[in-house]
Each structure stands twice: as C-alpha cells, then as structure tokens.
Amino acid sequence: MWHKNGVKPQSQRRGPPPPLNAEQLRELALRYVGKYATTRAKLRQYLTRKIRERGWADGAAPDLEALAVRFAELGLIDDAAYALAKSRTLAARGYGKRRLADQLRQAGVDGVDQAEAAAHADDAAVDAALRLAQRRRIGPFAAAAADPQQREKWIAAMIRGGHGFALAKAISGLPPGEEFDLDQLRERFRVIDA
C-alpha cells in the first residue's frame, strides 16, 4: 500500500530488526566505543540493552565481559583514562571528589582505576570549590554578607557539589568582595578533605 504522496512511510517499510549475531554485536561495540568515551561496564550495559531490544540469533549467549576485556586490551577502552578525564571535567565545572566518586561508581569504574582520578580531585579540590562558589555567588563572590541561614544554604550547596564540610564552611565564611590568600587556602585543605 502506498502513502498518499506515493512513498511508504519508513515505519511501514521495515519490519522488526533482525536478531544480532556475534559479528554484528562486535560491530555495534566498535561503533559505540568509537563514538563515546566509555568504560567496560557501560559497554556491557549498552550491548545488553541492544540484545534485549533485538534478540540473539546464535545459540549460546554472548560473553560480553570477554568482549569488553578484549577492547580494553586493544586500548579501545581505558577505565583509568575515563576516570581521569571525568575528574578534570568535573573539577573544571566546580565539583568535588565526592561527586566524582558517585559518577565513577555509576559508570562502573572500580577502585584501582579511580586512584589517579581521586589524586587529581584532591589536588584540584580548592580550585574546584572556588569555581563552584564563583558560579553560585558564594562567600567571597557574593554580593553581600550572608546571614547564618543563607550561609547554611551555601554550605549545603557546596556539599551537594561534592566538597567536604570543612572546605565548604571555610569558603562560605570568606567575606564578600575581599581578597583572600589562595595559596594559604590550598595548603590548609590539601589533606583535610581527602
């Protein structure tokens, strides 16, 4: 049956997609890792979803873990590099180590691959907290001094951003518009919120 303009709509031309086989699954995985920075766990989740959507043509269930490990051996997936890139991105946006840990846990990055990213988050903690404070107009970046209730809200916002309580309290307590010693602040919080 033809559409009123002479062409069948795409939804009427196609049937359901055929079930996947091992070669198609590998091609899907290659396309996915070529397009997105990903982890082994995220690749397994993606392939599991594709198999659920399209079905599996071969008899035995595919070994998705072996495929993810093979891609990691070939250097197509690197969980540690993903974690470090995520740490740099979040620090640049003003988020702290706890926010990083949550996102890496969701991405399926294990503790061994998180080490370098955690070290980077520790080193960038004060700078990231100041970026968040500047973006949210907290502490030295506020228009006016805060009352205790407003200061509590600032501290809560910084904690939700992944920063430790002591650092959030110190930054939110800085007087608005005044200069502060960045090096002294960095030295003070180098190890405390680790």
Which functions belong to the PLM regions below?
Residues 1-194:
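An alpha-helical, amphipathic repeat domain used for nucleic-acid recognition
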